Amino acid sequence: MSSLISYLFYFVAASASPLYRRWLAKNKNTENSGQIAFSFHVTVVAVLLSLGLLLYQPFHIVGNTSLLILATLMCGIFGSLAYVLSYTAQKHVEAGVASVVGNIYTPITIILATIFLSEKLSPIQILGTVILFIGMFIVSKKHRTGKFTFDKYFVMMLLSGVSLGVLITAERFLQKTTGFTTGTMLSWWTICLFLGIFTLITHNKHTYSKKDIVITGTLRFLQNLSWVILVYVVGNLSYVSAVTTFKVVIMFIAGAVLLGEREDLPRKIIGSIVAVLGLLLLK
């Protein structure tokens, strides 16, 4: 029952957050400026809310210090990169397409979990990865600049998914090594720190209201929380990464209904079905 509730929490939270960000990008920021600063301020809200995790478990670091520092830095670098790339590209990539492309994190996570977390990779999962790429190619029609080349925003969303795969693996290592609360907070706060540094270096500014920041930050916190709870409850990162890919279908439906993203819908539906079939083979 706890696993079922965790999955339901994830599907709701992980869909609401990107849909709201996509709506903001389309309606509140026509120039798509200040995304680094916006992602930083959103993350500040999320990490402040993460202090509530201390009610569940105290902050206590255990394990090899060098490995913990390395994993924490990887979370900071790749997590902040995933945020910046995703937030910058989201105005130009439809919610459903972004969901399919972002799921590149699944094979990345499975491969890294196999290497570093002693979780298994099977030949059928390799086939699933190939099918996923076919699905991504089908939905990418609008973003192709050549036969096998794509516009920069599609590539940015793809790289965001790759970065997310590294982040998830490093974060899972922290949780398994030093506990759920400590591992999660080390990851989230380091990401926030790196985003703050990027914002200072680039002198980035945005025009979103405090209300936009608080709502986006709260939804982002719930999305992040739903993921770490799900991984913690189920216990197998590869399995969770595969099952949660059903979010692709939810995002296409929600994007069409709530955001009016119905252009070339039959092709997108076919591409999403192919992608889901590939992702199912990754479980």
What does each model-identified segment do?
Residues 1-33, 146-182, 189, 215-219, ...:
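Glycine-/small-residue-enriched transmembrane alpha-helix faces in small-molecule transporters
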Residues 3-10, 54-55, 59-85, 102, ...:
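Loop-to-transmembrane-helix transition segments
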Residues 6-21, 29-81, 131-134, 183-204, ...:
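Transmembrane alpha-helices of multi-pass small-molecule transport proteins
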Residues 24, 38, 89, 115-121, ...:
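Hydrophobic/aromatic residues within transmembrane alpha-helices
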Residues 30-36, 84-101, 176-182, 226-246, ...:
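Structural motif at transmembrane-helix junctions in multi-pass transporters
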Residues 44-49, 101-116, 190-194, 222-226, ...:
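Alpha-helical transmembrane segments of compact multi-pass small-molecule transporters, enriched
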